[in-house]
Amino acid sequence: MEDLLKKKCKPCEGGVVPFDVSEIHKYQKKVDGWDITKDKNEIFFLTKKFTFKNFLESQKFVNVVGKIAEEEGHHPDITFGWGYSEVKITTHAIKGLSENDFILAAKIDQIPSV
């Protein structure tokens, strides 16, 4: 994972081939606790649910994720409520996973408990 933390997300407006299943599983080993999911269109996502003591902690976490996403120029889908936040990451422009998704996941995992 350390090598992912040193990297920065690269702008992607398409033209890049999404990771195949073997690449996805190789990179998944570098980010702890992230599940590989698919949506109804068969697009792969990295998904992780975080739990917190209350709503305010969930909200603080989401705000930090938002700051990281802006710095990286790569934006996850986030849902949150009382005591939880779920983060889903994909590279929308290519309708699949790329190294950017794993870089962002690794950086999100570095957020200290709020």
Where would I find each of the regions flagged by the language model?
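Long, contiguous binding/interaction regions
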Residues: 1-56, 60-114
